[in-house]
Amino acid sequence: MVFETSKATSYLKDYPKKDGLSVKELIDSTNFGGLTYNDFLILPGLINFPSSAVSLETKLTKKITLKSPFVSSPMDTVTEENMAIHMALLGGIGIIHHNCTSEEQAEMVRKVKKYENGFINDPVVISPEVTVGEVKKMGEVLGFTSFPVTENGKVGGKLVGIITSRDIQFHEDNKSPVSEVMTKDLVVGKKGISLTDGNELLRSSKKGKLPIVDAEGNLVSLISRTDLQKNQDYPNASKSFHSKQLLCGAAIGTIDADRERLDKLVEAGLDVVVLDSSNGSSVFQLNMIKWIKEKYPELQVIAGNVVTREQAALLIEAGADALRIGMGSGSICITQEVMACGRPQGTAVYGVTEFANKFGVPCIADGGIGNIGHITKALALGASCVMMGGLLAGTAETPGDYFYRDGKRLKTYRGMGSIDAMQQTNTNANASTSRYFSEADKVLVAQGVSGSVVDKGSITKFVPYLYNGLQHSLQDIGIKSIDELRENVDNGEIRFEFRTASAQFEGGVHGLHSYEKRLHN
C-alpha cells in the first residue's frame, strides 16, 4: 500500500514516539554511560526564518544579561584586561585571572571599566598654569593630548577651556601656559543630559570631546568621540545599565587573603566575581559566598566548579548567583586522570543545570568547548553560557608573546593546575595553589599541563565567527533563541541521537588525501 503524499505529515502520529531521543533518554547513564559533547548530535528542525533572526541573549547570573553566551576563562594565559575589554565589546564577558597580586588584578579591572565610558566620570583634568611642554609629556605617557582645563585642575572645578592636540601641535614654546593656547569657546552638555542626547550633541558639534557641566559651569564628566565610535562598532557591547561602562568579572580564591583582594576589586568597579576552585563543594567556598553576600549584597557571585546536583545544592543554598560546571574536561586539565575525580562534561552539564534551573540559577559550561557544535550542545543541555580557555588561547588578545616553532606561530597556553602556573608567583598571590587546595604542599601535584597553541588571530574576528556560527546552528535546529532552545529541549520537542565511534568518524572529515580546514574568512 502506498500512502497519499499530501498527507505525509499526518501519518507521523502513527509512530509511538518522535524520531530520536529526548534529553532524559540521552543522558541515561545506564544505557550510554557518561557523555561528552562528541557523543551525541541534535536532530534538525524546520527552518522558516533567517539566521540573523536568532537571538543569543542569555543570563550570566541572576541579574546580569549578556548579548552573547561567551565567557573567557580566568587563566593567566587567557584573560587579562585586553581580553576582558574585547570580550565585553563583543557581547560577552572576560573573567580576569588572579595568578597575580591583588593590586595588579585590581588595576586590570580598573582598565576595563575605564576603557569605554558613556560618561567619563574621572577624566584627566589640568589647570590653566600647566605648560604646553607638560601636556606633550602627558600625551606621551597617556596616549592622548586632549584635556579639559578647570580653574583648580580637578573634576568639579569651573571649566575654562579644553586643550587639544591641534592647539599644541605647532606651538614651539613649551613654556607657554595652556591658558594661552587652549580652546575657550566650548560646546558643553548640561548635567543630567542623556547619553543619547549627549552623543547627538557631540556629533553635531563635530568636536572630539563634550564636557558635561553643572548649573555653575563646573565640570562633572566628559563624553568622548572615540567612545561614540566604539558604540557604533560594537552595538552588542556588555555594559552596566547604570554607568554604561563595560562589564568586567574577576576570579578570586577562598582563602582569607582573598577577602582583602575582593575589597580592592570592588573598589575598582568589579561587576561579578568568580570563586575559582577545582571543587566548589568546600566549606571554604560556602563561607566565602556567605561573607560576600553579607558585605556586598549586590555583587554577583559565580560559584563552582561543580559536576553533581549535590554539589550545586550546597552552593545555591549559600547564595550563589550562578554556577560553573566542569571538572577535568578542559584540554589542558588532567584532574580526571590524576585524581580519579570528575565527570564527563555533557552528563555533568545536564545533571547540574536540570537542578539549578529550577531555582533560577544560571549555569556556565566550563571546559571541553572545542568548536561551535560544542557550544550549541552545552546550551541545549541547559547551560546559559560557555566558558572558553583553549578555544580563545592563541588569539592576539591573550597575554604573552608569540614565538615560532617548526614554522608555526604559537603562543603559550597552560592549565592553572600545571606546575608552571603553580610556581608563577609567591604563595599568597598564587591562584593555582589556592584553586587546587595546594597552598601548604611541599610537593606540588599537577592537575594540568603547559603547552602551546597556533595563532588564531584576533577575537574581533574569531568571536563574531562563533556568534554567527551559533546562530546558524540554532537555525538548523529550528530555534530562534537560547530560551526557546531550553524550553523545547525540556518539553521533548528537540530530539537527540547517540553517536557510536563509527558515527563520529563519519561526521568528521574523511576519505581525503589532504585538506585545508579554514574556519572563517
Curated annotation (Swiss-Prot):
CDD domains: CBS_pair_IMPDH, IMPDH. IMP binds at S331, D366, G367, G368, G389, G390, Y413, R414, G415, M416, G417, Q447. Pathway: Purine metabolism; XMP biosynthesis via de novo pathway; XMP from IMP: step 1/1. GO terms for biological process: cellular response to starvation; filamentous growth; filamentous growth of a population of unicellular organisms in response to biotic stimulus; filamentous growth of a population of unicellular organisms in response to starvation; GMP biosynthetic process; GTP biosynthetic process; symbiont-mediated perturbation of host immune response. It is found in: Cytoplasm. SUPFAM superfamilies: CBS-domain pair (SSF54631), Inosine monophosphate dehydrogenase (IMPDH) (SSF51412). NAD(+) binds at D276, S277, S278, G326, M327, G328. PROSITE patterns: CBS, IMP_DH_GMP_RED. It catalyses: IMP + NAD(+) + H2O = XMP + NADH + H(+). One of its GO terms (cellular component) is cytoplasm. Mycophenolic acid (MPA) is a non-competitive inhibitor that prevents formation of the closed enzyme conformation by binding to the same site as the amobile flap. In contrast, mizoribine monophosphate (MZP) is a competitive inhibitor that induces the closed conformation. MPA is a potent inhibitor of mammalian IMPDHs but a poor inhibitor of the bacterial enzymes. MZP is a more potent inhibitor of bacterial IMPDH. Also inhibited by ADP. Catalyzes the conversion of inosine 5'-phosphate (IMP) to xanthosine 5'-phosphate (XMP), the first committed and rate-limiting step in the de novo synthesis of guanine nucleotides, and therefore plays an important role in the regulation of cell growth. This is Inosine-5'-monophosphate dehydrogenase. It comes from Candida albicans (strain SC5314 / ATCC MYA-2876).
